[in-house]
């Protein structure tokens, strides 16, 4: 079992590493490519676009051909794209490399969640996804630090060579450690069960909405945090970095505590707790009389996301034993596109950073609480499938 957990964690971590590691080198990248930092900031959106594009096909391919046939090319593409970025001499080529990086990371991301659905029952999967969420929270803190240490001795291109090395490690794991987990092709008698695993299932759609809104909350916070903390609240850059590190610490602590909480409380209780924390955070930020109270509200955001997101993802994947790849893709596309659409629309309409965050917190909590209370699983689902090793 440990081989599946190690491989899944490695596959997922390519995604945040590809986002956070290069940011520290952005000024030098812009200077070398004769582009402005503002022009290269689009590299984040291009990377997410690549991930979303991969998710359009990766899940279906993973369900038809297996998890390894998607993970291996995905890791290989991430390696090639990382090298391509390091060799880019224009901003156009650099952005093209970032899109290809996103494609590779997206393939690996989808496969990771499908593997966890294949190999774990509902309760263990919720615990593992909570742990995975905690580990993912470490990357935004450690990746820039690692990038800074690399750039003390080497040029910015070395950042992408480091990403390529990470991709090689994931590729080796996928080739030699990961065993195929896709359930064997269903017999004729299993076709009704396969057809019943509809993406239009009310319970699945409710969890898609909940997880998409939750991701929108956390990405809105990350996207607006420089404005909130440095421009509105007046913190210096060093203080901003310290606060963000502390929020990551809160996220990690809660994420690592959630598996223990699942041994005491029902998953539904933790999901309700998550949304109550979001609502409390929104109200706190709306009426905050001081910076200290506002910072407390921010910690509630991090705690709320960490206590509920892994549980909601586990519930969303639960009904899908034969279509776990497609379900994972659907969740990923909804989360990436939904959160990006909200942030873009709020910017176009001219909603300020503070109100943008308060608005999504309150909307997420109200909608999600209603869905949690009124949309229950339609039927019991198989805890997990027996793992079939394919040659």
Curated annotation (Swiss-Prot):
Protein topology in the membrane: Multi-pass membrane protein
Transmembrane feature ranges: 4-24, 42-62, 69-89, 93-113, 131-151, 158-178, 203-222, 245-265, 269-289, 293-313, 331-351, 356-376
GO molecular function: transmembrane transporter activity
One GO cellular component, as annotated: plasma membrane
Lineage: superkingdom: Bacteria
Keywords: Cell inner membrane, Cell membrane, Membrane, Transmembrane, Transmembrane helix, Transport
Principal localisation: membrane
Pfam family, one: MFS_1
Cellular location(s): Cell inner membrane
Cytoplasmic side: 1-3, 63-68, 114-130, 179-202, 266-268, 314-330, 377-391
Periplasmic face residues: 25-41, 90-92, 152-157, 223-244, 290-292, 352-355
InterPro entries named in the record: MFS, MFS_dom, MFS_Efflux_Transporters, MFS_trans_sf, Multidrug-R_MdtL
Disulfide bonds: none
Similarity comment: family membership: Belongs to the major facilitator superfamily. DHA1 family. MdtL (TC 2.A.1.2.22) subfamily.
Cross-referenced NCBIfam families: PRK10473.1
Name under which the protein is recorded: Multidrug resistance protein MdtL
Source organism: Shigella sonnei (strain Ss046)
Record lineage: Bacteria, Pseudomonadati, Pseudomonadota, Gammaproteobacteria, Enterobacterales
């Amino acid at each position: 079992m440990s081989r599946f957990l190690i491989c899944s964690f490695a596959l997922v971590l390519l995604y945040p590493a590809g986002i956070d590691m290069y940011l520290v080198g952005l000024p030098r990248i812009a200077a070398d490519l004769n582009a402005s930092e503002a022009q290269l900031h689009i590299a984040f959106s291009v990377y997410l676009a690549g991930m979303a594009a991969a998710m359009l096909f990766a899940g279906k391919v993973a369900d038809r051909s297996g998890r390894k046939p998607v993970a291996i090319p995905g890791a290989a593409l991430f390696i090639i794209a990382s090298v391509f970025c390091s060799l880019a001499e224009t901003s156009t080529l650099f952005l093209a490399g970032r899109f290809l990086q996103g494609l590779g990371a997206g393939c690996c991301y989808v496969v990771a969640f499908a593997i966890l659905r294949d190999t774990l029952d509902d309760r263990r999967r919720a615990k593992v996804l909570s742990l995975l969420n905690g580990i993912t929270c470490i990357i935004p803190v450690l990746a820039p630090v690692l990038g800074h240490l690399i750039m003390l001795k080497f040029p910015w291109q070395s950042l992408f060579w480091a990403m390529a090395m990470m991709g090689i490690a994931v590729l080796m794991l996928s080739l030699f450690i990961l065993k195929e987990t896709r359930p064997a092709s269903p017999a004729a008698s299993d076709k009704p069960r396969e057809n019943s695993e509809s993406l239009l299932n009310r319970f699945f759609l409710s969890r898609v909405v909940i997880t998409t809104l939750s991701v929108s909350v956390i990405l809105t916070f990350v996207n607006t945090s420089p404005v909130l903390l440095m421009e509105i609240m007046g913190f210096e850059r060093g203080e901003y970095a310290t606060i963000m590190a502390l929020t990551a610490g809160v996220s990690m602590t809660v994420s690592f505590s959630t598996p223990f909480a699942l041994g005491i409380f029902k998953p539904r209780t933790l999901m309700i707790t998550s949304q109550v924390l979001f609502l409390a955070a929104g109200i706190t930020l709306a009426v905050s009389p001081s910076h200290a109270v506002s910072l407390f509200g921010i910690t509630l955001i991090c705690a709320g996301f960490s206590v509920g997101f892994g549980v909601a993802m586990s519930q969303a994947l639960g009904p899908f034993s034969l279509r776990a790849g497609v379900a994972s893709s659907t969740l990923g596309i909804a989360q990436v596109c939904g959160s990006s659409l909200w942030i873009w629309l709020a910017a176009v309409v001219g909603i300020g950073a503070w109100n943008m965050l308060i608005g999504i917190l309150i909307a997420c909590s109200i909608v999600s609480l209603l869905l949690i209370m009124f949309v229950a699983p339609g039927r019991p689902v198989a805890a997990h499938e027996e793992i079939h090793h394919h040659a």
